[in-house]
Amino acid sequence: ITLNPMFAQLNLKIKLLRLVDQQYWYLKLDNGLTVYLSRSQPSIQVERLLDVYSDVIASKVSMVDYVDLRYAHGMAVKFKKRIS
């Protein structure tokens, strides 16, 4: 899959790309963000992330544990637990 050009729009690069158990893609971006994609249509899922990244995720990326894009019409964002 050729996803790096898509992430380049946000000045991001894929640092690690792994197919897990032949079921889903695990991506680690150079800014530390972890992204999960389904095996089918990963570019459509990345487009969904690109649509909201600048407005929603970019300013909070250090607090995000992962973004899961394996849903048909949305995504899940898991935030890291705060240590007090």
Language model regions located:
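Charged, solvent-exposed interaction patches on well-folded alpha/beta domains
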Residues: I1-S84
